[in-house]
Amino acid sequence: MSNNVYERNRIKNDRYESGVIPYAKMGYWDANYSVKDTDLLALFRLTPQPGVDPVEAAAAVAGESSTATWTVVWTDLLTACDVYRAKAYRVDPVPSAADQYFAYIAYECDLFEEGSLANMTASIIGNVFGFKAVAALRLEDMRIPYAYLKTFQGPATGIIVERERLDTFGRPLLGATVKPKLGLSGKNYGRVVYEGLRGGIDFLKDDENINSQPFMRWRERFLYCMEGINRASAASGEVKGSYLNVTAATMEEMYERADYAKAVGSVIVMIDLVIGYTAIQSMAIWARKNDMILHLHRAGNSTYARQKNHGINFRVICKWMRMAGVDHIHAGTVVGKLEGDPLMVKGFYDVLRETELSINLPQGIFFEMDWASLRKCCPVASGGIHCGQMHQLVYYLGDDVVLQFGGGTIGHPDGIQAGATANRVALEAMILARNEGRDYVSEGPEILRDIAKLCGPLKTALDLWKGITFNYTSTDTADFVETATSNP
């Protein structure tokens, strides 16, 4: 008997021995595995239970997220099980973290239904996060193969087409969230939209929890918002919009609201992350068919994305949402009130905006990845930002971003229109300084003070918020370098 035949028989006898055997012995660990271009790769941060070998824990995750159950089953012999088993092929200790390991796992592409985010995630995150062999588990990064990416639509509109529709180039887009989130009547809501747009920003926005409550039903809100948009557009000569939140209890209701938004002239609609992956993909398909921009509010993400040792890293959510087809997603500000280490946020933005990804461990990007010509998704920076931070925002986030000032517009002492004007003037001044070759990062405060001499609303805003910062240490920081989380 040849050595190859003997080895195959040995593996078969060992692997299909009745009872409970280690996952690594069942074929879910292969240190010599050669990764294929068509493999989907996942990187997990493992914290094994005391006494559990890291390799066995990695094999257990591979098994439970692909074909395994807790015991050997003879029906494996009826499948191409050696092909369909996920393979953990590498385990590395996490730098400066005791008892944590990076586990690399490869999945055959045929394990996943084409174009279905729900099916892919049912495997990758379906059962394993409650598995007893691991004390904690976090999905840090994924490489989606080119062949599988081509089965997804990608962003409904994309950054390039959105700029063409708005006829706005060479600067970040400006937005603001209507405040207070809840309680306004439709007429007052529409007035906020008008004042903000008339002051110079590009978009107003519903917040995540404004849908159709007793104090303001959705039709009323849509109509008053569109009146404000149309008046502001006519007065300014600029294309304007307001993110009309069509999130609802059922898909039928969401389609009805989205169709109505289009019928009354909106260029953009909004949904919340909490509606689920299938609903998000469905709305993205609707948006592509109807030439609408689709904004996604990441409501709920920090319940599983913020903690460093358990959950899902937000960069993975960014990849999934670009695949699903949204045009905008909130992705952090660095300088605002929400979680956001500078390197981590840069990684999120690269995932959304680049056509190809290179390995960048300080930013948490572990895999090279070609986006297969899927359109770019525009990051949105919102949460505790104001015009006095404009130099930092432009430096960290670049041009292809929506800078969304909610309280930083609505909270201006002289009114909403003055707040919007302050933000627009601050942005235009910073872009001009950058284009002139000035060191706008270090000179930013001086640039703002100089232009404020010519703009009363900006001077008032700078005086009001000059001491406001949110320099808390981020929870999610880089594993491979020391990371400064304070702002320059």
Curated annotation (Swiss-Prot):
Q: Describe the subunit structure.
A: Heterohexadecamer of 8 large chains and 8 small chains.
N6-carboxylysine, modified sites: K205
Q: Which HAMAP family match?
A: RuBisCO_L_type1
**Which taxonomic lineage does the organism of this UniProt entry have?**
Eukaryota, Sar, Stramenopiles, Ochrophyta, Olisthodiscophyceae
Q: Where is the signal peptide?
A: none
Its function, per the record, reads:
RuBisCO catalyzes two reactions: the carboxylation of D-ribulose 1,5-bisphosphate, the primary event in carbon dioxide fixation, as well as the oxidative fragmentation of the pentose substrate in the photorespiration process. Both reactions occur simultaneously and in competition at the same active site.
For Mg(2+), which residues are the binding ones? Answer: K205, D207, E208
An individual GO BP term: reductive pentose-phosphate cycle
Q: Where is this site: Transition state stabilizer?
A: K337
| Single GO cellular component term | chloroplast
- What is the protein name given in its UniProt record? Ribulose bisphosphate carboxylase large chain
Instruction: State the Pfam families in the record.
Output: RuBisCO_large (PF00016), RuBisCO_large_N (PF02788)
Q: Can you say where in the cell this protein is located?
A: Plastid, Chloroplast
Q: Give the record's family classification.
A: Belongs to the RuBisCO large chain family. Type I subfamily.
Q: How is the cofactor bound?
A: Binds 1 Mg(2+) ion per subunit.
Residues of the active site: K179 (proton acceptor), H297 (proton acceptor)
